[in-house]
């Protein structure tokens, strides 16, 4: 059987985005622009985050947490006693049906006294954590990682803004530590033996899948993953394989970026192939604040006019997450 063609996913040195040299930053911006209008994906290298420590700490957590602890942390979709946990918490595997499992946490600044927590604003939750004695240092590491990847994402948003001909802070002014709705998801795909048939989905083209086609619900997505190729992106000629790189972050636009740019930077349709190997997928979904709204425009037009209507990020996120679950099922 012939192998699937590889997608063009360039490696972009994003380190200039942390500096002051505008000429170098514009080189990065042009590379981001080209990638965003091709396959929609690029690898960010020289990003400044210790991804090996991230991988090791996540593996240690996944292999030490017990079933009882997972249940105690489970989101409402799995544990009905946890009515306030819609996003943050543990997403369980289901024997004979779903092998993947994950732990999701939100902005560490969402404490009980946060105004948006106090007002019970949708999509805002206080994080839940495993017992510190059983998982010493995990919470401290996870919260620090949130801010590390937040900093990288802020730099990437500066690059996207420049790529679109805007001021550097065009996106980052809406991406604030006090109220960003971004999430870290620590996903584990286990090796299975035996393999329950229900764990494998089959696409219309016959490809075996772990997760069906979708667009990301985000402004952009910043993903670290194991060195196990599993993602495919849809292109006019069909689905193409995305090569893995466990030293870099895979970056792509979400559907909010597609909406506000009139699809100038589309959200690439992608899917997860079935690969029976132990691996990690650790996305950071870059989300703005609940009340933030970016006015849509069309970068391809001189006057920028578009018929796209503005939508607040909170409304977008709520509707997008529900639609994704309705389409592909609870993750």
From Swiss-Prot:
Biological classification of the source: Eukaryota, Fungi, Dikarya, Ascomycota, Pezizomycotina
Cofactor detail note: Binds 1 Fe(2+) ion per subunit.
GO cellular component: cytosol
Keyword flag Cytoplasm: yes
Binding positions for isopenicillin N per the UniProt entry: 87, 91, 183, 189, 281
Occurrences of domain Fe2OG dioxygenase (ranges): 176-288
Gene Ontology MF terms: dioxygenase activity; iron ion binding; isopenicillin-N synthase activity
Designated name of the protein: Isopenicillin N synthase
Record key words, sorted: Antibiotic biosynthesis, Cytoplasm, Dioxygenase, Iron, Metal-binding, Oxidoreductase
Subcellular location per the Swiss-Prot or TrEMBL entry: Cytoplasm, Cytosol
PANTHER family for this protein: 2-OXOGLUTARATE (2OG) AND FE(II)-DEPENDENT OXYGENASE SUPERFAMILY PROTEIN, OXIDOREDUCTASE, 2OG-FE II OXYGENASE FAMILY PROTEIN
Names of required cofactors: Fe(2+)
Location, primary (coarse class): cytoplasm
Annotated site residue numbers, Transition state stabilizer: 211
EC supergroup of this enzyme: oxidoreductase
Binding site for N-[(5S)-5-amino-5-carboxypentanoyl]-L-cysteinyl-D-valine: 87, 91, 183, 189, 214, 216, 281
Reaction(s) the record says it catalyses: N-[(5S)-5-amino-5-carboxypentanoyl]-L-cysteinyl-D-valine + O2 = isopenicillin N + 2 H2O
UniProt subunit comment: Monomer.
Protein family: Belongs to the iron/ascorbate-dependent oxidoreductase family.
Induction conditions: Expression is repressed by glucose. The transcription factor rfx1 controls penicillin biosynthesis through the regulation of the acvA, ipnA and aatA transcription. Expression is also controlled by the transcription factor pacC that specifically recognizes the 5'-GCCARG-3' sequence in the promoter.
UniProt-listed Enzyme Commission number(s): 1.21.3.1
InterPro entries: DIOX_N (IPR026992), IPNS-like_FE2OG_OXY (IPR044861), IPNS-like_sf (IPR027443), Isopenicillin-N_synth_CS (IPR002057), Oxoglu/Fe-dep_dioxygenase_dom (IPR005123)
Function (record text): Isopenicillin N synthase; part of the gene cluster that mediates the biosynthesis of penicillin, the world's most important antibiotic. IpnA catalyzes the cyclization of the tripeptide N-[(5S)-5-amino-5-carboxypentanoyl]-L-cysteinyl-D-valine (LLD-ACV or ACV) to form isopenicillin N (IPN) that contains the beta-lactam nucleus. The penicillin biosynthesis occurs via 3 enzymatic steps, the first corresponding to the production of the tripeptide N-[(5S)-5-amino-5-carboxypentanoyl]-L-cysteinyl-D-valine (LLD-ACV or ACV) by the NRPS acvA.
Binding of 2-oxoglutarate, residues: 279
């Amino acid at each position: 059987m012939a192998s699937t063609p590889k997608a063009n996913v360039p490696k972009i040195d994003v380190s200039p985005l942390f500096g002051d040299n505008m000429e170098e930053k514009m080189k990065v911006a042009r590379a981001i622009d080209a990638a965003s209008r091709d396959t929609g994906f690029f690898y960010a290298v020289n990003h400044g985050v210790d991804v090996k420590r991230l991988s090791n700490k996540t593996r240690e957590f996944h292999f030490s947490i017990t079933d009882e602890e997972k249940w105690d942390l489970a989101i409402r979709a799995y544990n009905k006693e946890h009515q306030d946990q819609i996003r943050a918490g543990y997403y369980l595997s289901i024997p004979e049906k779903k092998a993947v499992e994950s732990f999701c946490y939100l902005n560490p600044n969402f404490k009980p006294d946060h105004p948006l927590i106090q007002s019970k604003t949708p999509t805002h939750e206080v994080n839940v954590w495993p017992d510190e004695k059983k998982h010493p240092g995990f919470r401290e590491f996870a919260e620090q990682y949130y801010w590390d990847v937040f900093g990288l994402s802020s730099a990437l948003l500066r690059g996207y803004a420049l790529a679109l001909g805007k001021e550097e802070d065009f996106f980052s002014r809406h991406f604030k530590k006090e109220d960003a709705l971004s999430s870290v998801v620590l996903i584990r795909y286990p090796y299975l033996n035996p393999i329950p048939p229900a764990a494998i989905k089959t696409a219309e083209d016959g490809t075996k899948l772990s997760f069906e086609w979708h667009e990301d619900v985000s402004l952009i997505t910043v993903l670290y993953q194991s060195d196990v190729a599993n993602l495919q992106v849809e292109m006019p000629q069909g689905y193409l394989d995305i090569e893995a790189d466990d030293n870099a972050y895979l970056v792509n636009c979400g559907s909010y970026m597609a909406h506000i740019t009139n699809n100038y930077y589309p959200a690439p349709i992608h899917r997860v192939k079935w690969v029976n190997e132990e691996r990690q997928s650790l996305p950071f979904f870059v989300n703005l604040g609940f009340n933030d709204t970016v006015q849509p425009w069309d970068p391809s037009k001189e006057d920028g006019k578009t018929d796209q209507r503005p939508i607040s990020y909170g409304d977008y996120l709520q509707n997008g997450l529900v639609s994704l679950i309705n389409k592909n099922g609870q993750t």
